[in-house]
Amino acid sequence: TIHFLPFYPSSSDSGFAVKDHYKVANKLGNWSDIKNVSKSSDVMADMVINHSSARGLWFKNFLKKKEPGKDYFLTVNSKFNSSKVVRPRDHKLLKKIKIFKKTDYLWRTFSPDQIDLNFKNPSVLIQFIKIMIHLINNGVTIFRLDAIAYLWKENGSKCINLKQTHEIIKLLRNIINLLNVQTTIITETNLPEKENLSYFG
């Protein structure tokens, strides 16, 4: 098995601030290269599913309320209780933003350049199902779901390892089963053993 770290166009964090989830960065090659490798080895790729780049098309469209990108990113209002939130970095979590006269707060678990996606919007989930199928069609047989434990947020919770996240992973697994392809999902979950084990099966 060959694990390719994020090969998408990105703006920071060693490739994990993805600007376009459908492309291979020009400096790294193209989809034909990945397909060629997949002929002789299993290919594992990161699906950076929790967040996307603040410099990508989705976020630019989000600010303009255009598709694709409209309502793709997570914002909360001033009443949201984030006091229990668990996260790995210490920069300011929320950034005040005003879009078309409405003031909200952008959610940024990992960095100011990585804006968390809003999986309460079904369009975001549908988009990542399409991305997953696109990767399968281009030779990827193992998915590493990056930062998956942080995917879902609820007011007043730790915003990590919530049941809704598990349901989304199960849905992705069921779609793979329907496609009848030999594909494995691996979750990046840096959690205590009992919580880590909850992602198996």
Task: Indicate where each model-derived feature is located.
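Acidic/aromatic-lined carbohydrate-recognition and catalytic surfaces
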Residues: 1-129, 137, 148-201
